Design a protein with these regions (language model features):
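Flexible, surface-exposed loop/gating regions in the mature catalytic domains
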Residues: 1, 23, 46, 79-96
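Core SAM-dependent methyltransferase catalytic element
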Residues: 84-132
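A short SAM/SAH-binding and catalytic strip from SAM-dependent methyltransferases
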Residues: 1-16
Length: 132
């Protein structure tokens, strides 16, 4: 199980490597579950994952390239109130409710209370299997 890590791997340029290493570590029939902040399919995917959001199709493609089969998805971590379009990416929402670390002017008008009503991010929950 990996929880909210894919965007970090994308930012570091080693997302494909991570999926390949999971594949190598698992026995045939082994299961990999991925929970990640979900970017709507209609939005443009930054290959560096800079907003913290990743499209399901993008994650499925990475897993497939590594050799995994897609098994199922779940909406257990879904949040339909999250548009994934926030000034500081996923870090705009709780629990971070963050401001930019650089102290930019944009932070002056930021009102974290507006984002608390959204709640935490919408998350994809995906299950993959290493073929037998």
């Amino acid at each position: 199980l990996t929880f909210r890590n894919v965007h970090n791997w994308m930012g570091g340029g080693y997302a494909d490597q991570a999926f390949e290493e999971f594949y190598a570590a698992l026995k045939p029939g082994g299961i990999l579950c991925v929970v990640e902040h979900r970017l709507p399919e209609t939005a443009s995917q930054d290959p560096r994952g800079s907003t913290g959001y990743v499209q399901e199709s993008y994650m499925k493609d990475m897993a497939k390239r590594a050799g995994f089969e897609f098994v199922a998805s779940s909406e257990v971590n879904a949040n339909p109130n999250d548009t994934a379009d926030h000034p500081f990416g996923v870090w705009t929402l709780p629990p971070s409710s963050g401001l930019p670390e650089d102290g930019s002017e944009e932070a002056i008008d930021f009102e974290p209370e507006l984002y608390k009503n959204i709640g935490e991010s919408d998350r994809a929950t995906l299950k993959f299997r290493k073929p037998l």
